[in-house]
Regions:
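Active-site residues of response regulator receiver
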Residues: 8, 54, 84
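Short hydrophobic/Thr-rich beta-strand motif most characteristic of the beta2 strand and flanking loop
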Residues: 26-34, 42, 201
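Acidic catalytic/metal-coordinating carboxylates
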Residues: 35-38, 60-67
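Active-site beta3 strand of CheY-like receiver
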Residues: 46-52
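Receiver (REC) domain active-site loop signature in two-component systems and cognate sites
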Residues: 57
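Short, flexible helix-to-coil linker/hinge segments that flank and couple to helix-turn-helix
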Residues: 92-97, 102, 107-159, 163, ...
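Recognition helix of helix-turn-helix DNA-binding domains
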Residues: 171-206
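Basic, Lys/Arg-enriched C-terminal extension of HTH/homeodomain DNA-binding domains
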Residues: 196-227
Length: 227
């Protein structure tokens, strides 16, 4: 059973999410928070496995609430899925930097939200396709650092690892990566683990941040275009 805490300042939104989550036999709503401070407090007392967190809330916004949850050693197992009307790049980056394991916009289909909760609760990371595509577009247009020029330089990754990183950054799971590259799921998982180790990333979501900030992902036509 996945224990879910809902954090949103709008009562009707919380009620709708509670009804949806409660309809799934594998999920249970263990608390509702109307402010960021309430979300942090309830995360400590309700023994939630996952927090569905809105960004815009009074007293403490969802990003800072996420940061406090992620920094609390007693809440080390609690995952945060940010669900909001905001889908700007800065909000996505801030949420992932704060420790969120996923980011979805509120126009997500109900079935996709439930699937996202399962994915994040299982330890995977998840991003809405639209925002992810925009992030990657910015990554690909960013100046590339010199190979091996820093602790997270492209020279640290093999060609295959760069391919895998590009697919991770686009939101593909290990099975989809394996199918795309003609690998076994176990081999894809091994590549992802090695990349996370080399780049000192805590999870797949942070790999997107690393790609976004360092330009590790190179577009297929970059060499021809001179980018």
């Amino acid at each position: 059973m996945i224990r879910v805490l809902l954090a949103d300042d709008q009562t009707l939104v919380r009620a709708a999410f509670a009804m949806l989550v409660g309809s799934d036999p594998d999920m249970e709503v263990v608390g509702e928070a109307a402010t960021g401070l309430e979300a942090v407090a309830l995360a400590r007392t309700a023994r939630a496995d996952l927090v569905v967190m809105d960004i815009r809330m009074p007293e403490l916004d969802g990003i800072e609430a996420t940061r406090r949850i992620a920094a609390d050693e007693d809440l080390a197992g609690v995952k945060v899925l940010v669900l909001t009307t905001y889908d700007t790049d800065d909000h996505i980056v801030d949420a992932l930097r704060a420790g969120a394991s996923g980011f979805l916009v509120k126009d997500t289909r109900p079935a996709d939200l439930l699937a996202a909760i399962r994915t994040v609760a299982a330890g995977e990371s998840l991003l809405s396709p639209g925002p992810t595509a925009r992030l990657i577009a910015r990554v690909l247009s960013a100046p590339q650092p010199p190979a091996g020029g820093g602790p997270a330089g492209p020279g640290m990754l093999s060609d295959r690892e760069r391919q895998v990183l590009a697919l991770v950054a686009r939101g593909l799971n290990n099975t989809a990566i394996a199918e795309t590259l003609g690998l076994s799921p176990l081999t894809a998982k091994t590549h992802v683990s090695r990349i996370m180790g080399k780049l000192d990333a805590r999870d797949r979501a942070q790999l997107v941040i690393i790609a976004y900030e360092s330009g590790l992902v190179v577009p297929a036509g970059a060499a021809a275009d001179g980018n």
